[in-house]
Curated annotation (Swiss-Prot):
This is CTP synthase. It comes from Prochlorococcus marinus (strain NATL1A). It catalyses: UTP + L-glutamine + ATP + H2O = CTP + L-glutamate + ADP + phosphate + 2 H(+); L-glutamine + H2O = L-glutamate + NH4(+); UTP + NH4(+) + ATP = CTP + ADP + phosphate + 2 H(+). The gene is pyrG. Homotetramer. L-glutamine binds at residues 354, 382-385, 405, 462.
Amino acid sequence: MAKFVFVTGGVVSSIGKGIVAASLGRLLKSKGYSVSILKLDPYLNVDPGTMSPFQHGEVFVTEDGAETDLDLGHYERFTDTAMSRLNSVTTGSIYQAVINKERRGDYDGRTVQVIPHITREIRERIKRVANNSGADVVISEIGGTVGDIESLPFLEAIREFKGDVKRNDVVYVHVTLLPYIGTSGEIKTKPTQHSVKELRSIGIQPDILVCRSDRPINDELKNKIGGFCGVNSEAVIASLDADSIYSVPLALKDEGLCKEVLDCLDLNDHESDLKDWERLVHKLRNPGPSVKVALVGKYVQLNDAYLSVVEALRHACISHDASLDLHWINAENIESEGAEKLLQGMDAIVVPGGFGNRGVNGKIAAIRWAREQRVPFLGLCLGMQCAVIEWARNIAGLEDASSAELNPNSKHPVIHLLPEQQDVVDLGGTMRLGVYPCRLQANTTGQSLYNEEVVYERHRHRYEFNNSYRTLLMESGYVISGTSPDGRLVELIELKNHPFFIACQYHPEFLSRPGKPHPLFGGLIQAAQIRVPSSPSEAFNPQSKIIEKKSLEQQ
């Protein structure tokens, strides 16, 4: 029988509930418990797949093809456990399910209401994760802030949940903020007291308080908070601002968060094994020489839009004893100012995914710069499509080459709509989504990096390489190093006689893990460390023993 942890947040939004939930998952796993984490988002969208990256940040794709909140990426990276579509719940998906049941007559003519029907559906979703994952502990992060009207059905549902299970099968963790007032020189507890009061008014008494602060919290303050909030002082956990999100699990362990959770759940407090995580944090705090990486995108004003890409770069740098010096380059600025001005001095260039016309010419210019100046390059999804367009225009002689998405009237649509997408009308959840196999060609950089014949990668796209141009581009020097097993879909391309130039149709960033960097990102960083060689004979060699050839596990 699974145990359940509910993580709520108060005082302000973006308090760090996702990192707390992911960190707790890491700590529980280090003690031998299996964990699954789900996110309950209070917005009315069915999923974030159609939301602007400026509104929501990155859309994280699970192996079964769900478009989810970026927090699921944190859950997977911290616990090294694959989540599924069941781990992402929104108000929109709950209401959609309840309305569909009402239309089918499942409620036998009863009046359908928020209580009990919506709250029961929420509880069933949580239990479904427990049943399908078989996890010892299921952690649920409730999005939003206590006091928001949007979160009320979820808070009511988790209040009701304690009536479905034994008391020691559920624990409530509330994350709050302790602001410091400089003029008085004091840390203020009143916002936390009021947040807990609001939570109590709903019927939830938190068992544990995780208090965010930018300065240490002494025992006297913990006793005060515990006394006013009805929580044991040992269960008042200080969470100080950290130098890295990866140091948070160790800090929370030292504060006793995991012990308090295990005590509440009546679980044995086994010896923890965090040696690998401690080594990871040590390397983060003691990096080697910096590597300048340009991330050329169209959503760079919001860093969260490329969260998994940044984390994958960070994982690769940790593995190769490098310090990531990330430069955010707006693709539109390249169009107006030129690639040389903005990319001069970069050790590597990454062009990530995206949609639409804006900034595409800047991405193509950046790719041309990487190719001609022999700067290590990695293209992801749209980044691969732009790389194909750049080569077709400037090397293969197809001046009008483009994507059918960007220019429907192009004479040479080297990127076109997938056949199965021709009659698709709805935007949400209709792309090529989730894990698909990719067969790698022997004696290529891609195959050497993966050290596998077939790999499994996550996709999110509607457009694909147009096979009508495959022969022409290959004859002009393009290398197709990975395809679908039937050879129909081009998944991975690269160039010979270049230090490192590789691009993929999929999203490898979703499979990168701390301590287990994705091979493509690892190859990019190693090539960047070597810098730009002066001749092809000095080019990056993927057979080098320096590379950690860690194959992807089939999820």
